[in-house]
Amino acid sequence: MKSIAERMTIPQLIVYVSKFMFENDLTDIAGGNISARDGDVLYMTPTLAGNQWHWNIDTDDIVSGPVTKIDDLKQDPRFTREGLSHLAIYKAFPYVGAVIHAHPKYINPFVACSKTIPPMLSASMQFGELQYHAEAAHYSQDQAEKIVDVLKSQEERMQKKAAAVLMPRHGIIVASMNLMTALDCVQRMNTNAFTVLAQKWLE
């Protein structure tokens, strides 16, 4: 039996992941963005996919372009607001095949007050304690570079599965070898964040 990724094109898979994330509180209407690389072509969700379409997007809405023509991709009016961070990750780590920026329900309380998230479950130990990038303006090239700085110490994690960076008062960004693994890791991290929060109930 073929896996979900084997049954779909990259644009179809991005649409699937978008809806899965929204329906499972892994992101919200306020934002988030998803991208994937297939050879020399990049694919990204359009800007305001949550705000304007409630993540009910189709393959025709996906922004795409060759890696060799990044400037053209940036000029597309649908270029996602966090696109600079996605592009910086792909440039710094050519083996990365997917990037997800999200606002997961149980990670949000941590990023609201810039608290790191320790691993509590065996499923999340591989990610270590989730850390923040240094302060930077949202959607800026400065932010993109500071995200890359945090990921530089996590290359082994990205090559094996995925690595994450927490974004102050904003959300999380995850880089992985492929999109399904990135999605898997976003959910693991969100479940782990819930587990950390739930410890208070057991005291």
Describe the role of every protein-language-model region.
Residues 1-203:
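Glycine-rich flexible loops
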